[in-house]
Amino acid sequence: MHDRLISGTEKPEDHFDRAIRPTSLADYIGQPVVREQMEIFIGAARGRGEALDHTLIFGPPGLGKTTLANIIAREMGGNLKSTSGPVLERAGDLAAMLTNLEEGDVLFIDEIHRLSPVIEEILYPAMEDYQLDIMIGEGPAARSIKLDLPPFTLVAATTRAGLLTSPLRDRFGIVQRLEFYSVEDLTHIVTRSANLMNVPMTSTGAAEVARRSRGTPRIANRLLRRVRDYAQVKGTGEVTHDMAQRALDMLNVDKDGLDTLDRRYLSMLLERFDGGPAGVEALAAAMAEDSGTLEDVIEPYLIQQGYVMRTARGRIATNMAYLQFGLTPPEPKN
């Protein structure tokens, strides 16, 4: 897997971001529809003295799903217990977490699409009836007992909502999709992070970092740290527009947030395959990559931004891709 600076997937150094994450909905920047809805749902649940309905949050990596789960727990006044789908391998793992919950607590499960069917079966009665069915003993002497659980809220996050089973998806009372952020919202996020990090920064410097962050706060904060380093060594320490531009150019992140791997993909599609259609396996072979890397790492942003179309016949470069490389788009075929 490529260690890309502009990957939305969390890296070890991103743990630093936890210190600058917002802790309340009032501080939460962007996602106005989600924020307004959650303010209403949380306020109503608190007013009734009830646990918030189970909440599913989905969207691309790096948009703030974990941050929102933390905010929900804090706003509801409960403790947050965190785990992830791949970690919950045995029924006993989940049972231990559920029985340690107190009333009003939030259980956060990241990558919930990777839960095993056995674990899902345990979750169903826990979500619906606040009950835990566990087996005592083995063989013919085995018996099932029910344990009552305190009212709690399950907050689940996934980047692949389509992989969730219908029975699991249907048990969430609240479903929120996080969208890519606007440059304006990302500029506010970068400015806030710079202030918390004591990094002097101009408004145009913040906007330049935001513009190249692919609509993703995690990438914006990562780029901010690298630009800060550059300004500290190559300048006075202040992140100006010029300083941000020079730093990001050095890091091979262009004005549209594309990196070397993105440009190599587009160049291959345009030149080797005449703009397509090209099958993903053929593209992967030409780039000496595996098709999974193309589908999961490279293509999502290029498709979302309109550089590439995915069709039944294969990948096709759009006019925007031609213009990105200074090429003349082909005439439409009749």
From Swiss-Prot:
Localisation per UniProt entry: Cytoplasm
Record keyword NADP present: no
GO terms for MF: ATP binding; ATP hydrolysis activity; four-way junction DNA binding; four-way junction helicase activity
Binding site residues for Mg(2+): 66
Reactions mediated catalytically: ATP + H2O = ADP + phosphate + H(+)
Keywords for the protein's UniProt record, in alphabetical order: ATP-binding, Cytoplasm, DNA damage, DNA recombination, DNA repair, DNA-binding, Hydrolase, Nucleotide-binding
EC number: 3.6.4.-
Residues the entry annotates as binding ATP: 20-21, 62, 65-67, 128-130, 171, 181, 218
Function: The RuvA-RuvB-RuvC complex processes Holliday junction (HJ) DNA during genetic recombination and DNA repair, while the RuvA-RuvB complex plays an important role in the rescue of blocked DNA replication forks via replication fork reversal (RFR). RuvA specifically binds to HJ cruciform DNA, conferring on it an open structure. The RuvB hexamer acts as an ATP-dependent pump, pulling dsDNA into and through the RuvAB complex. RuvB forms 2 homohexamers on either side of HJ DNA bound by 1 or 2 RuvA tetramers; 4 subunits per hexamer contact DNA at a time.
Family stated for the protein in its record: Belongs to the RuvB family.
Quaternary organization: Homohexamer. Forms an RuvA(8)-RuvB(12)-Holliday junction (HJ) complex. HJ DNA is sandwiched between 2 RuvA tetramers; dsDNA enters through RuvA and exits via RuvB. An RuvB hexamer assembles on each DNA strand where it exits the tetramer. Each RuvB hexamer is contacted by two RuvA subunits (via domain III) on 2 adjacent RuvB subunits; this complex drives branch migration. In the full resolvosome a probable DNA-RuvA(4)-RuvB(12)-RuvC(2) complex forms which resolves the HJ.
UniProt xrefs under HAMAP family: DNA_HJ_migration_RuvB (MF_00016)
Listed name of the protein: Holliday junction branch migration complex subunit RuvB
Organism of origin: Acinetobacter baylyi (strain ATCC 33305 / BD413 / ADP1)
Gene giving rise to this polypeptide: ruvB
